[in-house]
């Protein structure tokens, strides 16, 4: 196997190993080479990556190698983390989020009755964005999951508590809850 391919496979192994990292002896076993050769390969990769000015580096922690971002780029990564999650949500996810916010705890079936369409994908998106979570189980057949909002939901939308959600007036009850929710959010951000 050529050195270039060994480096490529090592890079892939580092990626797959994630935060836990991978030990030189594990890489050696996979590549069917000596551990000393792995150490040389990693050193060559570190040197090459540094020379190319790449955003990732290989670090060794507790004898395991792992990929890490460069400290000098931390302000840029923080900007990504500070970006509001709502910007990346689909209209369906936003509508579902509004329903959960106002009607929690609520089951998926109840959400689907309100929206008139399936909400499974929207729910998965909201859970993955940590905006909603399972808060219990409803009584009845199948004991369906109950969903509610999270602290991240409050933080994302600048709310202290759920009581800060704009009240639904009787005249607005006919209006789409999602539209009401976002109109209210615009008022809060003024």
UniProtKB/Swiss-Prot annotation:
Task: Quote the InterPro entries the UniProt record gives.
Answer: ScpB_csome_segregation (IPR005234), WH-like_DNA-bd_sf (IPR036388), WH_DNA-bd_sf (IPR036390)
SUPFAM superfamilies in the record? Winged helix' DNA-binding domain
Transmembrane spans: none
Question: GO CC annotation: what is one?
Answer: cytoplasm
Q: Pfam families this protein is in?
A: SMC_ScpB (PF04079)
Q: Name one GO biological process term.
A: chromosome separation
Q: What does this protein do?
A: Participates in chromosomal partition during cell division. May act via the formation of a condensin-like complex containing Smc and ScpA that pull DNA away from mid-cell into both cell halves.
Under the heading NCBIfam families, the entry gives: SMC-Scp complex subunit ScpB (TIGR00281)
Q: Quaternary form?
A: Homodimer. Homodimerization may be required to stabilize the binding of ScpA to the Smc head domains. Component of a cohesin-like complex composed of ScpA, ScpB and the Smc homodimer, in which ScpA and ScpB bind to the head domain of Smc. The presence of the three proteins is required for the association of the complex with DNA.
Family statement: Belongs to the ScpB family.
| Record-given protein name | Segregation and condensation protein B
| UniProt organism field | Bacillus cytotoxicus (strain DSM 22905 / CIP 110041 / 391-98 / NVH 391-98)
Q: Which gene encodes it?
A: scpB
